Every structure is written in C-alpha cells, then in structure tokens.
Regions:
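Glycine/tryptophan-enriched, flexible segments
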Residues: 23-24, 163-234
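Residues at the starts of beta-strands that form the adenosine-phosphate
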Residues: 27, 55-59, 145
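N-terminal Rossmann-like or analogous alpha/beta NTP/dinucleotide-binding catalytic cores
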Residues: 38, 46-59, 66-122, 126-133
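Structural beta-sheet core signal
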Residues: 30, 60-62, 148
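Cofactor-binding loop segments of dinucleotide-utilizing enzymes, especially the Rossmann-like FAD-
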Residues: 33, 63-65, 151
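Short helix/loop capping segments that flank catalytic or ligand/cofactor-binding pockets
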Residues: 39-41, 157, 178-179
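Active-site neighborhoods of enzyme catalytic cores
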Residues: 102-173
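N-terminal regions that are enriched for targeting/export leaders
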Residues: 1-29, 33-34, 40
Length: 234
C-alpha cells in the first residue's frame, strides 16, 4: 500500500501492522496527538491521499486524554487553543474535525472503537510513552491498516533511523538531506475526499460553543482528572 504514497509522505511513514489494504467502507481516521496544524501536516495530507484514492470519507480526530505525564490545566488549555485553530481551519478546508476531551461521564475507548470501524488509521508519530504504547495497542487490535507519520522532523525519523549515537554525527551524516529539504517547498495535496458524516463512538465537544466561550471551557476542564494547580499563563 505504501508504494502508492507520494514520495515526500512515504519517507515519513511507518506501517504499524500487517493489514495491507483499507478495510470496509468506514472513515479514514487521522488521529492527531501532537501535530495540531492543518498547514504542511503530513498525517492529514496522507489521510486526504488515501481517502481520495480509495473513495472513502475522511475524519480528523483530536483526542485530549488525561493520562499523559503531568497533565495540567495549563497544558490542557494550550491543547484547547490548538483545537480552536484546527476546528476553524478544517471547516474552511472542507474537512470534518471532531474533538474529544476525556472527563467525568465522557471516557469511552474512542480509538479502540475506531480500530474496528475505520477503513484506515493514520496518526502523527510521537515516539514517547504513553503514546507509543497506545499506538502499539491500536495497531495490534485493528482490523484496518495503521500508519504513523513523522510530522515534526526535517529529516524524517523513519528515513534515517538510529544509526548514529551523537548529535554531531547525525548533523554530518544528514547535511545534504537537511539542505535539500529545507530548500524545498512542501508539495500540495490536491485530493478532496468527502468528509465523514456517519456515527461516532463518542459525543464530540462543540468547539464553537464550549471551547471558544472561556466560561464553558473552564467548566469542561473542571471535569477533567488533571492537575488544577498549574494555571494557564496570562
């Protein structure tokens, strides 16, 4: 399946399980954990490519969990600020973006459900626990292909790997690769897949009503199991 990916996306992508082709007619789900931007986002671009190539609907899923290290009111607030930008950007681009915030009364296993209903899952590569463990678990149980994509590094992690053990060795070994990529314009993906409009395994947060409104935002945050003593910066 990866042989059909655009080269600038293929070099950033890892196939995380043995499922070789999209499964069923469910959505292509782009699961965002750290790369909360629409512009030059390889995970979203790959999702658009796969969805269009296979005539499948596309869904951009942003889940904010309480279980990451040092989860706090400050960090959650920054994540919700990013959600506002993502919601507006995806709407303008004709993409379906949905936000889930884990909190009292709202803690379903969203990705576990998507692992059985999605046609394909793409996520941004974030090689630290607990996120690596979550991706491993979803990839192992999923009925569809699961890919993770490096959305952060100039030299893609899947391309170079771990063959050096010192920063200066890495700089020397990748000098030409880095120069080539820094000078290049990020290719545009013109694919326009249909947005997914079907049922979801959770109730999405209404970003416009419940996140942009700061009173409602902090009411929602009060239901999250996070450290409330680390306050947002003003």
């Amino acid at each position: 399946m990866m042989e059909g990916f655009p080269s600038h996306l293929a070099e950033r992508t890892r196939h995380r399980n043995s499922v070789a082709a999209p499964h069923g007619s469910g959505p292509v789900v782009v699961w965002l954990k750290s790369s909360f931007r629409l512009h030059e986002n390889p995970a979203i671009d790959l999702g658009r490519h796969i969805a269009a190539e296979h005539s499948l609907p596309l869904l951009i899923y942003h889940g904010i969990d309480e279980r990451y290290p040092h989860a706090s009111l400050r960090h959650h607030t920054m994540l919700l600020d990013a959600a506002v930008d993502m919601d507006e950007g995806c709407r303008k681009a004709g993409l379906r973006y949905v936000l889930h915030v884990a909190r009292d009364g709202h803690r379903p296993s969203v990705m576990k459900a998507f692992s059985q209903s999605a046609s394909c899952i793409i996520t941004d590569l974030f090689p630290l626990p607990p996120w690596t463990n979550w991706v491993d678990s979803i990839a192992a149980s999923s009925t569809c292909p699961v890919f993770d994509v490096d959305c952060h590094c100039v030299i893609p992690m899947p391309l170079f790997g771990k063959s050096v053990d010192r920063p200066y060795k890495f700089r020397d070994a990748t000098k030409k690769m880095r120069k080539k990529r820094l000078q290049a314009t990020w290719p545009t993906i013109d694919a326009r897949p249909e947005p997914y409009t079907g049922p979801l395994p959770f109730e999405p947060v209404n970003v416009n009503e419940d996140i942009k409104n700061l009173s409602k935002r902090f009411e929602l945050l009060s239901k999250c199991s996070i450290d409330p003593s680390v306050l947002p910066e003003i």
